[in-house]
Protein backbone atom coordinates (compact mmCIF):
# COMPACT_ATOMS: atom_id res chain seq x y z
CA UNK A 1 0.00 0.00 0.00
CA UNK A 2 1.36 3.39 -0.96
CA UNK A 3 1.57 6.17 1.62
CA UNK A 4 0.70 9.79 0.87
CA UNK A 5 2.97 11.67 3.25
CA UNK A 6 3.66 15.09 1.73
CA UNK A 7 1.46 17.98 0.60
CA UNK A 8 2.78 20.35 -2.01
CA UNK A 9 2.57 23.92 -0.73
CA UNK A 10 -0.27 25.91 -2.34
CA UNK A 11 2.17 28.56 -3.61
CA UNK A 12 4.12 25.96 -5.62
CA UNK A 13 2.89 26.00 -9.21
CA UNK A 14 2.80 22.60 -10.88
CA UNK A 15 2.41 21.98 -14.59
CA UNK A 16 -1.30 21.68 -15.36
CA UNK A 17 -0.68 18.51 -17.38
CA UNK A 18 1.02 16.87 -14.37
CA UNK A 19 -1.92 17.65 -12.08
CA UNK A 20 -4.45 16.58 -14.71
CA UNK A 21 -2.82 13.14 -14.99
CA UNK A 22 -2.75 12.60 -11.21
CA UNK A 23 -5.39 10.25 -9.77
CA UNK A 24 -7.87 11.86 -7.41
CA UNK A 25 -8.72 11.15 -3.80
CA UNK A 26 -12.24 12.37 -3.05
CA UNK A 27 -12.88 13.10 0.62
CA UNK A 28 -15.61 14.76 2.67
CA UNK A 29 -14.63 17.61 5.00
CA UNK A 30 -14.47 15.42 8.10
CA UNK A 31 -11.97 13.10 6.42
CA UNK A 32 -9.95 16.05 5.07
CA UNK A 33 -9.43 17.16 8.69
CA UNK A 34 -7.70 13.90 9.57
CA UNK A 35 -3.94 13.73 9.23
CA UNK A 36 -3.91 9.93 9.39
CA UNK A 37 -6.41 7.72 7.62
CA UNK A 38 -6.84 4.79 5.28
CA UNK A 39 -8.49 5.86 2.04
CA UNK A 40 -9.30 4.67 -1.46
CA UNK A 41 -8.33 6.60 -4.58
CA UNK A 42 -11.01 7.12 -7.20
CA UNK A 43 -9.13 4.51 -9.24
CA UNK A 44 -9.91 1.93 -6.54
CA UNK A 45 -6.39 1.76 -5.10
CA UNK A 46 -6.15 1.68 -1.30
CA UNK A 47 -3.68 4.16 0.20
CA UNK A 48 -2.61 5.44 3.59
CA UNK A 49 -2.60 9.17 4.32
CA UNK A 50 0.06 10.19 6.82
CA UNK A 51 0.46 13.97 7.09
CA UNK A 52 1.65 16.36 9.82
CA UNK A 53 -0.87 16.79 12.61
CA UNK A 54 -3.12 19.78 12.09
CA UNK A 55 -3.19 19.43 8.30
CA UNK A 56 -6.55 20.18 6.71
CA UNK A 57 -6.79 19.25 3.05
CA UNK A 58 -8.64 21.43 0.58
CA UNK A 59 -10.09 20.76 -2.84
CA UNK A 60 -7.27 20.93 -5.38
CA UNK A 61 -4.44 20.13 -2.96
CA UNK A 62 -1.77 17.83 -4.36
CA UNK A 63 -0.18 15.10 -2.25
CA UNK A 64 3.02 13.18 -2.95
CA UNK A 65 3.18 9.42 -2.41
CA UNK A 66 6.23 7.63 -1.04
CA UNK A 67 7.06 6.51 -4.58
CA UNK A 68 7.03 10.11 -5.86
CA UNK A 69 3.65 9.91 -7.61
CA UNK A 70 1.13 12.75 -7.29
CA UNK A 71 -2.45 12.49 -6.02
CA UNK A 72 -4.99 15.31 -6.29
CA UNK A 73 -7.52 15.96 -3.52
CA UNK A 74 -11.17 16.56 -4.43
CA UNK A 75 -13.86 17.72 -2.00
CA UNK A 76 -16.67 15.17 -1.93
CA UNK A 77 -20.29 16.35 -2.10
CA UNK A 78 -21.95 16.00 1.30
CA UNK A 79 -25.12 17.05 3.07
CA UNK A 80 -24.86 20.74 3.94
CA UNK A 81 -27.07 23.70 4.80
CA UNK A 82 -27.14 26.49 2.24
CA UNK A 83 -28.02 29.77 3.94
CA UNK A 84 -29.23 32.87 2.09
CA UNK A 85 -30.91 36.08 3.17
CA UNK A 86 -32.93 38.89 1.64
CA UNK A 87 -30.35 41.46 2.75
CA UNK A 88 -26.62 41.44 3.63
CA UNK A 89 -27.20 42.49 7.26
CA UNK A 90 -29.27 39.39 8.01
CA UNK A 91 -26.60 37.16 6.46
CA UNK A 92 -23.90 38.96 8.46
CA UNK A 93 -25.88 38.44 11.65
CA UNK A 94 -26.18 34.73 10.84
CA UNK A 95 -22.42 34.51 10.22
CA UNK A 96 -21.76 36.26 13.54
CA UNK A 97 -23.87 33.80 15.53
CA UNK A 98 -22.29 30.83 13.77
CA UNK A 99 -18.84 32.24 14.52
CA UNK A 100 -19.79 32.58 18.18
CA UNK A 101 -20.37 28.82 18.16
CA UNK A 102 -17.06 28.10 16.38
CA UNK A 103 -19.00 26.45 13.56
CA UNK A 104 -17.01 25.77 10.36
CA UNK A 105 -18.60 27.96 7.67
CA UNK A 106 -17.99 28.33 3.96
CA UNK A 107 -18.55 31.94 2.90
CA UNK A 108 -19.59 32.59 -0.67
CA UNK A 109 -21.08 35.40 -2.73
CA UNK A 110 -24.48 35.86 -1.08
CA UNK A 111 -24.52 32.59 0.86
CA UNK A 112 -23.15 30.68 3.83
CA UNK A 113 -22.67 26.94 3.83
CA UNK A 114 -22.28 24.67 6.85
CA UNK A 115 -22.61 21.03 7.81
CA UNK A 116 -26.21 19.91 8.26
CA UNK A 117 -27.38 20.48 11.83
CA UNK A 118 -31.09 20.72 12.73
CA UNK A 119 -30.44 22.91 15.78
CA UNK A 120 -28.39 25.41 13.78
CA UNK A 121 -30.92 25.29 10.94
CA UNK A 122 -33.67 26.29 13.37
CA UNK A 123 -31.54 29.11 14.82
CA UNK A 124 -30.75 30.43 11.36
CA UNK A 125 -34.40 30.43 10.33
CA UNK A 126 -35.29 32.33 13.50
CA UNK A 127 -32.72 34.93 12.47
CA UNK A 128 -34.67 35.43 9.23
CA UNK A 129 -32.53 33.50 6.77
CA UNK A 130 -33.59 30.99 4.14
CA UNK A 131 -32.06 27.59 4.91
CA UNK A 132 -32.03 24.76 2.38
CA UNK A 133 -30.48 21.33 2.79
CA UNK A 134 -28.47 20.34 -0.25
CA UNK A 135 -25.68 18.02 -1.40
CA UNK A 136 -22.49 19.86 -2.33
CA UNK A 137 -18.74 20.03 -1.61
CA UNK A 138 -17.95 21.84 1.66
CA UNK A 139 -14.94 24.14 1.91
CA UNK A 140 -15.10 26.18 5.13
CA UNK A 141 -12.91 29.17 5.86
CA UNK A 142 -9.41 28.41 7.10
CA UNK A 143 -8.24 29.79 10.45
CA UNK A 144 -7.73 33.55 10.31
CA UNK A 145 -4.36 33.31 12.06
CA UNK A 146 -3.05 30.49 9.91
CA UNK A 147 -2.41 28.08 12.75
CA UNK A 148 -5.79 26.46 12.93
CA UNK A 149 -8.61 26.66 15.42
CA UNK A 150 -7.49 25.95 18.95
CA UNK A 151 -9.81 24.60 21.59
CA UNK A 152 -8.13 26.73 24.15
CA UNK A 153 -8.40 30.07 25.82
CA UNK A 154 -5.09 31.39 24.57
CA UNK A 155 -4.51 35.16 24.43
CA UNK A 156 -5.91 35.57 20.93
CA UNK A 157 -8.98 33.48 21.68
CA UNK A 158 -9.63 35.38 24.93
CA UNK A 159 -9.32 38.76 23.21
CA UNK A 160 -11.58 37.76 20.33
CA UNK A 161 -14.13 36.24 22.69
CA UNK A 162 -14.17 39.32 24.95
CA UNK A 163 -14.71 41.56 21.94
CA UNK A 164 -17.51 39.35 20.63
CA UNK A 165 -19.18 39.41 24.05
CA UNK A 166 -18.91 43.20 24.17
CA UNK A 167 -20.49 43.58 20.74
CA UNK A 168 -23.18 41.07 21.66
CA UNK A 169 -23.92 42.90 24.91
CA UNK A 170 -24.15 46.30 23.21
CA UNK A 171 -26.39 44.89 20.49
CA UNK A 172 -28.79 43.43 23.05
CA UNK A 173 -28.64 46.36 25.44
CA UNK A 174 -27.00 44.61 28.36
CA UNK A 175 -23.52 43.68 29.46
CA UNK A 176 -22.93 39.96 29.10
CA UNK A 177 -19.88 39.37 31.23
CA UNK A 178 -18.04 36.11 30.88
CA UNK A 179 -14.79 35.70 32.74
CA UNK A 180 -12.24 33.63 30.88
CA UNK A 181 -9.34 34.00 33.29
CA UNK A 182 -9.67 30.40 34.36
CA UNK A 183 -7.08 28.09 32.95
CA UNK A 184 -8.34 25.74 30.25
CA UNK A 185 -5.26 24.16 28.83
CA UNK A 186 -6.91 22.76 25.71
CA UNK A 187 -4.36 23.73 23.14
CA UNK A 188 -4.84 20.71 20.91
CA UNK A 189 -5.23 21.65 17.31
CA UNK A 190 -7.07 20.28 14.32
CA UNK A 191 -5.74 22.55 11.61
CA UNK A 192 -7.07 25.64 9.85
CA UNK A 193 -10.81 25.93 10.12
CA UNK A 194 -11.33 22.46 11.48
CA UNK A 195 -13.51 22.43 14.59
CA UNK A 196 -14.99 18.96 14.74
CA UNK A 197 -13.76 18.50 18.28
CA UNK A 198 -16.81 20.38 19.56
CA UNK A 199 -18.91 17.31 18.81
CA UNK A 200 -16.57 14.70 20.22
CA UNK A 201 -12.81 14.83 19.75
CA UNK A 202 -11.51 12.60 16.99
CA UNK A 203 -7.72 12.81 17.26
CA UNK A 204 -5.72 11.08 14.60
From Swiss-Prot:
BP-aspect Gene Ontology terms: protein folding; protein-containing complex assembly; urea metabolic process
Disulfide bonds: none
Biased composition range(s): Basic and acidic residues: 172-190
Any one GO CC term of the record: cytoplasm
Region (Disordered), start-end ranges: 172-204
Family the UniProt entry places it in: Belongs to the UreE family.
NCBIfam families for this protein: PRK13261.1-1 (NF009751), PRK13263.1 (NF009762)
Record's protein name: Urease accessory protein UreE
Gene source species: Burkholderia orbicola (strain AU 1054)
Gene this protein is translated from: ureE
